[in-house]
Amino acid sequence: MFGSEIKSFVEHPHFKRELNERALEGYLSFQYSPGYETFFKNVYKLPPAHYFFYKDGKMDMQRYWIPEFNAEEDKPLEYWVDEIEKTFDDSVNAHKIADVEVGSFLSSGVDSSYVACSADVDKTFTVGFDNGEKYNEISYAKELSELIPVKNYSKTITPEEFWGNFGKIQYHMDEPLADPSAVALYFVCNTCLLYTSPSPRD
């Protein structure tokens, strides 16, 4: 059997829901399941940069790409600054190809702020938690959005919404993930749906 989600296996009559204790060890160390094993025994992830053929009961897995790192220590710092900026801009532009408005997620962090500024987006989307300023970045996101300037859409997640949707979020993730940003990502995606086109093409 193969699928894009583990949950696609669970209804199969021959599938056994058995805990993979080795994945549990990795989870307790890294807060997620690293590597190619999963929390389910005998269920594996397809490794990055791999594909497989399945024929006559046999699976043949092949690697199609290996990253190469060639050190060029003789280049000055200014060269690498320009290279990083060019690579970043190329990536942003590749993700902006659309015939509709483009938006981006925005927190108070440097990475999402840089993307929002460089991509010349039309909208930004932010969520925060309803427990004071410590875990709520909405005010900073709105401030940056005004400077760009673009319209910022935001949502404050209440404790009731957090715990009320936690089971659903875990269901979609297939495996335990001890990173609360998964909850924020779920809600910011739902916030996007309220202010963007429902068309599958968009």
Residue ranges and their predicted role:
Residues 195-202:
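Conserved small/polar residues in nucleotide/adenosyl-binding loops
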Residues 1-174, 185, 189:
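Cysteine-centered catalytic environments shared across enzyme families
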Residues 179:
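Substrate-binding/specificity loop regions of serine endopeptidase catalytic domains
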Residues 192:
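Hydrophobic pocket-lining residues that define ligand/cofactor binding sites across diverse proteins
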